[in-house]
Amino acid sequence: MEANREKYAADILSIKEAHDRIKPYIHRTPVLTSESLNSISGRSLFFKCECLQKGGAFKFRGACNAVLSLDAEQAAKGVVTHSSGNHAAALSLAAKIQGIPAYIVVPKGAPKCKVDNVIRYGGKVIWSEATMSSREEIASKVLQETGSVLIHPYNDGRIISGQGTIALELLEQIQEIDAIVVPISGGGLISGVALAAKSIKPSIRIIAAEPKGADDAAQSKVAGKIITLPVTNTIADGLRASLGDLTWPVVRDLVDDVVTLEECEIIEAMKMCYEILKVSVEPSGAIGLAAVLSNSFRNNPSCRDCKNIGIVLSGGNVDLGSLWDSFKSSK
């Protein structure tokens, strides 16, 4: 399906432009394979290791593109966002590279390792309550006080274009891929991947992986409109956001299916990433593998014929204490 910028917030041209813009700063992450996981799944799996990206997650691509897209006057005043996780660290790092300030509104209770990354990369942490209304209210106040530019974690064409560069690289690295499995939360990652991949290879299938405790995307696809959940409950802290008005049209039109996973399936997949692939992956990053190994995927007619599957390991920022507790609880 042809994707154009008149219909969506990004397109293959903006994604290619983003790749040219950010290429000097990002890692071209490797694609790993495992005969053991191929045997378990009955398919050929290709793991795009964004857990090895700068900042420990795919988010650096979009944040870097957004920062580098600012003109000199905008950049001088800095950037602001509200985020509990990897976007916060990614934007801090992108701003540091450009030598501009980054104001990061972080909700109380955010994972310590992700807050530590913000501080490590020079972001100015401003605490909020854990509610979205508090995050947005404080971010708005910072905007008024500083004149900085808001960089939304996912509902932004520059962010979507940056994340889409993952698919450009993956399809250059492994041409025979017939499906890509992508974690879904706010939809910035899967929107970029879908727009790029389906422009390059229209027959490719894009499958979203989502926790059952935060299954707003699955519900939205069924309802044909954005469904927002009042409460989410999942170990995958990076997959609790709701779809945005820029990401929803792409998810609605270009994402072929959504596979929802139990917590135990996510934890087991994370263990496999450590024990078999030998890479550090957070729960949100491991959910793509969980999807491919699930009965839901195996029995889904839209997934059954997918033999060469790309899986985006989206991030690797996890508190070691929480990781250990998760592994112990799964025994």
Curated annotation (Swiss-Prot):
Keywords: Allosteric enzyme, ATP-binding, Calcium, Isomerase, Lyase, Magnesium, Manganese, Metal-binding, Nucleotide-binding, Pyridoxal phosphate. Its EC number is 5.1.1.18, 4.3.1.18, 4.3.1.17. Homodimer. Mn(2+) binds at residues 210, 214, 216. Catalyzes the synthesis of D-serine from L-serine. Has dehydratase activity towards both L-serine and D-serine. Displays high substrate specificity for L-serine, whereas L-alanine, L-arginine, and L-glutamine were poor substrates. Ca(2+) 2 binds at residues 210, 214, 216. GO terms for biological process: D-serine metabolic process; L-serine metabolic process; serine family amino acid metabolic process. The active site is at 59 (proton acceptor), 84 (proton acceptor). It comes from the Eukaryota. The keyword Nucleotide-binding applies. Pfam families: PALP (PF00291). Optimum pH is 8.5 for racemization and 9.5 for dehydration. Expressed in the whole plant. Its cofactor is Mg(2+); Mn(2+); Ca(2+); pyridoxal 5'-phosphate. This is Serine racemase. The gene is SR. One of its GO terms (molecular function) is pyridoxal phosphate binding. ATP binds at residues 34, 54, 121, 278, 317. Disruption phenotype: Deformations and branching of pollen tubes grown in pistils.
